[in-house]
Regions:
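Non-catalytic accessory segments flanking enzymatic or RNA/DNA-binding domains
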Residues: 1-117
Length: 117
C-alpha cells in the first residue's frame, strides 16, 4: 500500500529563512505518513522534518494500491497547488517542493480529497 500525504511544517529552525507562514509538503510514502516521518528522522537526523520544524501536522493522506497510482495522484495535487514557493538550505531527502500555506491551497487540498476534517 502507498499513500499520498499532505503535512503542514511550521516554526522552521533551520538556517536559511524565517517564514511567517506555515509550509505545505505533499509526498508519497509506503504504509502511511507516520512511516515516512519516522524513516525521515531515522535516516536524516539533524536534517529531518522533526529537527527542522517545531510543529508538524498531518493534514491528510489518501491510500493507493500501487506506487504508480500514488505518484500520478501526487503529480495532480502538486499541479493543483501551483509552483513551489521556496527551498530551504538544508538537504532533506524527499523535500524538493515546499509551498507556503494559503487559504487557496488548503481549498485545493480539500477539493482533491487530501485534506481530512
Amino acid at each position: 500500500m502507498y499513500v499520498v500525504y499532505a503535512i503542514r511544517l511550521d516554526d522552521y529552525v533551520g538556517r536559511s529563512l524565517s517564514p511567517s507562514q506555515a509550509l505545505l509538503k505533499v509526498g508519497v510514502s509506503v504504509h502511511d505518513v507516520w512511516y515516512r516521518l519516522d524513516a525521515n528522522e531515522r535516516f536524516e537526523g539533524k536534517n529531518s522534518y522533526r529537527a527542522l520544524f517545531k510543529k508538524i501536522e498531518v493534514l491528510g493522506q489518501k491510500k493507493f494500491d500501487t506506487k504508480d497510482q500514488a505518484e500520478a495522484y501526487e503529480k495532480m495535487v502538486l499541479a493543483g497547488l501551483g509552483k513551489k514557493d521556496l527551498s530551504i538550505a538544508e538537504t532533506v531527502k524527499g523535500v524538493t517542493e515546499l509551498r507556503v500555506e494559503t487559504p487557496g491551497r488548503l481549498e485545493t487540498l480539500q477539493a482533491l480529497g487530501l485534506l481530512e476534517g
